[in-house]
Amino acid sequence: RANTYVDVGVDGIMIHSKKNTPDEIFEFSKIFRKNHKFIPLVSVPSTYNAVTEDELVKNGFNIVIYANQMLRAAYPAMHKVAESILKNGRSLEVDKDLIKIKKILELIPGTK
């Protein structure tokens, strides 16, 4: 299928795997790179998260997308804050765990 995409002018190929090792995507990249040396290959290592970016590059990948790690990290923190607010009826107890509003606003251009 990837060869067909390349034939019709695709700009790059993103491959994903539900397996917990990169073996499947490395096998694909080895075969794909024989015929397509310059088409960008994109990896999304959500399940095979022990693989390093260096290993991906050595196996022919050009782009790595960490598609959901930030969301998965944020959810437990948000859950903890919500539980504390419900328990205490206020947010004072979680202030120590929160970024200051001023710091958040500084992230937005033009709000300093």
Question: What are the language-model segments listed below?
Answer:
Residues 85-112:
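Flexible C-terminal active-site loop/helix
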Residues 1-66, 72-84, 111:
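Alpha/beta enzyme core
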